[in-house]
């Protein structure tokens, strides 16, 4: 705080002058002392000037409602919500999230710097704090076929932007622990800044080498045992509760049962669709679920506020105390995290405010370029002996590498409701590259599903129990320039167009929510397991940095052994 601001604010802090806004008779949650104190909160120029007894030019009597810091999402991909960034921010604000630390690697994988510039522009000037982590692995691994490359040299100009905090999730852990030159350049560039991790199943010395590189966080923990190993290595665990990956319960139960200190834990959503946010909440849901599992309410709130602010060096966020930005949430119920009102920089968020969305450059609406495939192209020769296939795990984005004798005719794989066929097709540069593989555990029958949201290269992925439905699904996504589609037989049941880079809708969130809910219902009717989110599960099947086995445009890839399966 500079001298001029101090001279203006100090008289309000001392109570000699009335503050601009005073929220009176609040039960204030103090994240430093872990107390609930009945106090007034005084605000001037968007800054908290005092917590005590104050008078204001404007006063709001909270009549004993709880007042806590605005919630922070430690890691999310705005694109994964499927709606324009301002739509998502507006929706999540209603649930108390006032700070978003985003990794825009989806749009950068599709459109390079143009995608990053789009995200910066779309999130500028909103009634929330939106910070960016620059994508570290574009493409995710060197052999991936995506739409752009984001090198250390291309990152450097963005470091001057005050909203850029650090380096986004480092997925290519092999490049880190082997100190490969391209990765070393990026780590060196961000030497004094925070670096996010992505480290599923790294063990012992590998995890030590990863942490040695200065990587501070990880959101890929799926159980308490692995979370504990990361904490022991000095890392901050970002507990994820998204649409596809729901890891909170397993980790939080471990924290509770072992009386683990919560200081090295934060909350994130990572990839959470707008329909789930509207139904469950945002970071508020992580807090509520943790409290229900036995975490003391104030510790759960700390995991959503000050823990994250400290981790990311956001020194004026995450607490209700003098000098902190006046971002706070008013709660009717602490245990239920029932949001009554939200304030950002001392101004009440208007839930009814019309959302203004800036136009998208036209070239970002033409990103899907698929070959004209035939049923013959999709044939997959298989032996009479066991073949490698992808086994999906219900409720998780990890997979199992299994071998089985596949149903076949004339030496070619014949998909059915048990053994589906998945196809991934390069869509950025019109190369015509594609690959086919068998899948166990998705259980789709009498149709196909396809998506252009396919982490992280975002090629088009289709899965089904017959070639004709798969081909129709691919054709439909070419027609609408990206999105989700559901096919039953030879009929398009429903399509959710995502014309902005094949990732984002230009319709309002309510239209997206309604269509998505309908399509998920169709998928479960057609056999997809109840706890599998069909589109999230499919969107991760081509990401070759999450164990154990994936499919890329070059074929089946063994993530554990780091090699293609021939």
UniProtKB/Swiss-Prot annotation:
Keyword Manganese: yes
InterPro entries: Adenine_deam, Adenine_deam_C, Amidohydro-rel, Metal-dep_hydrolase_composite, Metal_Hydrolase
Domain of life: Bacteria
Cofactor: Mn(2+)
Keywords linked to the UniProt accession: Hydrolase, Manganese
EC number(s) recorded for this UniProt protein: 3.5.4.2
One GO term of the biological process aspect: adenine catabolic process
CDD domains with a match to the protein in the record: AdeC (cd01295)
Family to which the UniProt record says this protein belongs: Belongs to the metallo-dependent hydrolases superfamily. Adenine deaminase family.
Protein name listed in UniProt: Adenine deaminase
Phylogenetic placement of the source organism: Bacteria, Bacillati, Bacillota, Clostridia, Eubacteriales
Gene, per the UniProt record: ade
